[in-house]
Amino acid sequence: MLPEWKLFIKEVEGKKENLQGADLGNKKLMGANLAGADLTDADLSISYLIKADLSKANLTNADLTGAIMSEANLKGANLGGAELDDAFLHGTDLTDVINLTCDQLELANFDNETKFPEYIQIDWSSDKTFTCCEREG
């Protein structure tokens, strides 16, 4: 028998095309396959999204405050207007993410293992200090 949180993941994965405005705050979604999910305006605050597949997901205006997304795959996701305050992006793949800004990143936590889209330049001055620059496309 699967633990309750794994059953919940299966339920969420089955509805991934229709999760606009969903309340997924403070949920265990580790390793969830949410590739291509429509999470517009969803509440994912303080959720555990470690190693989750959010590639090409629409996270427009999603609340990811305090979400733990370490080693998650967000390749090609839309992060326009998403709240990333205190989100953990350590080792997260943000390659080809669209609508990500330095303003969002300055409120998040990440490390030198985090992969950024080509239009975001991160220059580290120490282990915890960086400057972020958005390049013109």
Where do the model's predicted regions map?
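Tandem repeat scaffolds
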Residues: M1-G137
